[in-house]
């Protein structure tokens, strides 16, 4: 799912799939993820952004996880590792985030910025690390999205308030 990127994301994705969908950007990351989930067709959904990378060791660990994952697991959390060159969250270098989802569960993304899912399912915390290689400082964008949501009266989850405090 592309939200209007200008960094060749769609062209790169086309090397791996013909299932590329456009989503009009409405300042809401959770809406974009919910749209992406609606397009999924496999048993599990791996949720990733264009600036996230799996190195060889973690790619191998993810492939191995597929063979040992118990059927009652609904979500696998992976360590989100921020590259510190543009990172404003210096005190949160590595944290667990939900990244792999069982498709048959009705997960809903919440919060327009620092989006997450309601975690009522059975969750497995893996050792897999997703490297976040952001290309710039996203603080202005994040705060702008937060204030637009606030002005609309959208409830901001405690998790998001914590993320914003780290910025």
Question: Over which residues does each language-model region extend?
Answer:
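Acidic, glycine/proline-rich Ca2+-coordinating loop motifs
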Residues: 15, 19-20, 98
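Residue-level recognition of beta-strand->loop/alpha-helix junctions
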Residues: 2, 22-24, 79-81
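A short, glycine-/small-residue-rich helix N-cap motif at loop->alpha-helix starts
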Residues: 20, 24-31, 37
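Active-site nucleotide-sugar/metal-binding loop of Leloir-type enzymes
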Residues: 15, 34-44
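A conserved acidic beta->alpha catalytic loop
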Residues: 2-11, 25, 49
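Hydrophobic targeting segments
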Residues: 1-2, 146
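Catalytic-site signature of metal-activated, phosphate-bearing donor transferases
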Residues: 31-37, 48, 54-167
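Acidic helix N-cap motif at the loop->helix transition within catalytic regions
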Residues: 7-16, 57
């Amino acid at each position: 799912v592309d939200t209007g990127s200008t960094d060749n994301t769609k062209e790169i994705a086309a090397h791996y799939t013909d299932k590329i969908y456009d989503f009009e950007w409405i300042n809401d990351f959770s809406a974009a993820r919910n749209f992406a989930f609606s397009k999924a067709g496999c048993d599990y959904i791996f949720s990733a952004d264009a600036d996230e990378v799996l190195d060889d060791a973690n790619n191998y660990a993810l492939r191995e996880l597929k063979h040992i994952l118990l059927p009652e697991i609904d979500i696998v959390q992976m360590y989100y590792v921020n590259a510190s060159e543009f990172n404003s969250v210096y005190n949160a270098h590595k944290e667990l985030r939900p990244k792999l989802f069982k498709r048959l569960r009705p997960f809903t993304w919440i919060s327009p910025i620092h989006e997450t899912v309601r975690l009522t399912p059975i969750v497995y915390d893996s050792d897999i690390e997703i490297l976040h290689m952001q290309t710039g400082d996203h603080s202005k964008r994040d705060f702008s999205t937060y204030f637009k949501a606030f002005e609309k009266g959208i409830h901001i989850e405690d998790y998001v308030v914590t993320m914003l405090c780290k910025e």
